[in-house]
Amino acid sequence: MNKILLMAGVCALLSSAAFAQLNKVAVISVWGDKNLSDDPMDTKMYEVLMKDTSFNISHIVHDFDNLLIQDILPEFPFPFMDKADVVSAEGYQELKELSTYKNPAVSYSIIPAKDYVPLAAFGAVLQDDEAIVKAFELLPDVDGVMIAYINFNMVDAGGVGPYAAKKVQAYCNIKIFNKEGKRIFKLKESAPSDKKVSSVGGIVTEPKKITPLVFQASDNLFADIKKTLPKKLAKMVKKIEKENAK
């Protein structure tokens, strides 16, 4: 099995042979997570912010979905099934019964893009393997499925002792799986907010000040993706062609 890593961020091809054989892929889940903890299962940290109705990342998730369709998917060396055909496929919406996020205890920070079922794709930590494999039964014309999500963390940004400043870091995560449910490709890009917020003992004392930093970090992330992703994927495809020519 070959692994190819490209430049800053992570663009990893976990199996070049499997990736090269993909003829058509379907995006089966796009979502965002407004839990700012490092642990995807920890919904206690920043709980006040997550329950604040003014902290709404729906339009960020909408923009991410559009970015995926318009700027990211066309850069891959194979076609994708139309979103409308995926989300309207018989049985697709029932995948939510196999989703980790059908449980309100872990789903209240999860914001799915319009019409998509949110599916977990954290590898050994937490992954909806049954739903991923089931998707191939519902979409028999594809030999790969993609899950894409955006999430955020608070990161240190200078300061002394317990009075460290914090920034928001935004992450784009894209993963492709084969019919056995094995991940064969992953991409992770990130970008920070420009501005900072003060904290005491590592805890932000005014959670509402975080909201504009989340929007700023996502704007920076989307701009970076548009600028750098085409080159990264082109380089990856070139390496695949070299591998296959040996």
List the predicted regions and their residue ranges.
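C-terminal/domain-edge helix-coil "capping" segments
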Residues: 21-39, 126-157, 161-246
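N-terminal segment of the mature soluble domain
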Residues: 41-147, 179-186
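Short, intrinsically disordered/low-complexity patches at protein termini
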Residues: 16, 105, 207-210
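Generic alpha-helix detector with strongest preference for long hydrophobic helices that associate
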Residues: 8, 45, 49, 53, ...
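Sec-dependent N-terminal signal peptides
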Residues: 1-16
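Active-site-adjacent structural segments surrounding the nucleophilic cysteine of cysteine proteases
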Residues: 20-21, 53
